[in-house]
Amino acid sequence: GQGAMVASGASLIENKESGIIKNNNSIGMYILGDSESLAINRGIIANEGFHGMWISKGTGENYGTIRNQSEYGVSLLYNASFENYGLIENNGAYGIWAYEGSTAVNQAGGIVRNAGNNGMNVITEGAVLTTAINNGLIENTGEYGMSSTGVNGSVVNNGTIKNLSKYGMAAVEGSSAVNTGIIENVGSHGMSASTGASAINEGTIKNIGSRGMNAENGGTIENKENGIIANTSNHGMHAIGIGSLAINRGIIQNTGTYSMWIGANAVGKNYGILQNKGSYGVVVADKGRMENYGIIENTGDNGI
C-alpha cells in the first residue's frame, strides 16, 4: 500500500515510544495532502523503502528515532512543516528534504547525523520561501550537512554543525545559507556558495580543514561584523571565478596558511580585521582583485 500509517482529513497518526515501523516498501508515515493532519513519531522508524515520513501540506514531529538507509528519512512537500526533537540518522540520500514552501526545523536537543548525501536539504523551483533551520546538532560525515537550491531556498544554522567531510553548509543556484551558530570544519568547506548563491557568517567558523568559507562560479560569501573565522589550516576565506565575491566585515584569525585567497577574476573586500599569525594575510592571483578598507594585523610571514 501507500504507507504503514496514513492520515488525511484533519487526522492524527502517532507512533508511540514502544512502536517500531519497518518500512521496506513505500512510506512509513504519510500525510496525504492535508494541511490539518499531524504525524508524530515517538518510537523508531527504520526506512529502507522510499520515505520514512512523508508530509504533504501537513505537520510532522519526531521525538524518537528515524533511521534512513534509502531515499528520504523525512520529506516535506507544498507548505508542509516538520520539527525534529529526536534523532535522524541518514545513510541514504536525504535525512530531511524540504520542497516548495515547506519548513524543516531541527530543534535544540535534536540531532541529525548524515553519512549519506544530505543531512538537511532545501529545493525550490517557485516563488515561495522554502527553509531548513538547525537549532540543534548536525554531524556530517557525508556530502552536505545542510544544502539549498533555488532562488527562494534558505538554510540557517543557529546551532552546531560538525563537518568532517565535504560541506558543512552549501548554497547553489541563487539560494542562501546563513550561520549564526558554530561550524566546526575538519573537511573541505565550512560554508560554500556558487552559481549566484550567498553564504553569510554571523557566528563562528572554526576551520582546521580546507576552506572556512568558499565562493565560486559567481557565489558571494560574507563574514559579518559579529562573525569570526578561526583558520588554523588552509584558507579562512577563498573565492575564485568571474562574479565571485568574498567580503570580510568581522574578524579572521589566521594561524594557518591564508586569511583570504582571491583568484581567477574573483573580488575580495576587507572592512574588518585580518589577524595573520600564519603564512599570508591576503593572496591575490590570476586576475583577482583585493580591496582593503579595514585592518590587516600581520605578525606572520606576509601581510599581503
Report the location of each language-model feature.
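Short aromatic-enriched loop/helix-cap "lid" or pocket-rim segments at secondary-structure transitions
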Residues: M290
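Short beta-strand/loop motifs in extracellular/secreted proteins, especially
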Residues: S11, S37
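Beta-strand-rich solenoid/repeat architectures in extracellular/passenger domains
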Residues: G1, L12-N25, R42-G49, Y63-S70, ...
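Beta-strand repeat architectures
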Residues: S18-G19, G33, G218-G219
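Glycine-rich beta-solenoid repeat tracts in large extracellular/virion proteins
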Residues: Q2-S8, I27-D34, F50-K57, Y72-Y78, ...
